[in-house]
Amino acid sequence: MYKTLYTVLVSFLTISVATGLTAAEYKGPNLSGQTVSIAGPWLTGDEENFDKVNAYFEKATGAKVDYAGSDSFEQQIVIDIKAGSPPNLAAFPQPGLAANMAAIGGLVPLGNDMENWVKNNYAAGPSWVDLGTYPDKNGNDQFYGFF
């Protein structure tokens, strides 16, 4: 369920922002009653802007978004992952930290469909995929996100 939820959320946020998709036009799964936890570094004005995107997502999908912004995100995400209580999504401000978390099995790959979507829909798609691809705990390259 979580991999599907990650993919739905990432896909929706990316596509809706890129294309101007309205909440009424959303055709993905109904996520009513589910909560999506997101951790990131955004505070004050940046958090307010992100909250607007989250409100849009909530309206379209029926899910509730629980965003926790922190000026110590880099430390907190490591603690949360190692404790086994990570958020559903994390907005990493630096790819190196995301790569470190992937290497210990702390991230869930987005899969080939999302990787191909980014390659085909971003002007420098392959570069974005490269930036979000890291070895997993077994040393296999996986696509975890885009920046």
Q: Where do the language-model regions lie?
A:
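Short, polar/charged alpha-helical segment
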Residues: Y26, L43-K64
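Mature, Sec-exported extracytoplasmic domains of Gram-positive
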Residues: L31-Q34, G45-E48, F73, D113
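Short, well-ordered beta-strand elements
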Residues: S32-L43, A63-A68, L89, Y144
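Short, low-complexity disordered leader/linker segments with a strong preference
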Residues: M1-V36, K59
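Alpha-to-beta junction loops
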Residues: I81-F92, G106-V108
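Short helix-initiation/N-cap motifs at beta->coil->alpha
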Residues: G69-Q76
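Hinge/lid segment of periplasmic solute-binding proteins
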Residues: A24-N30, L97-F147
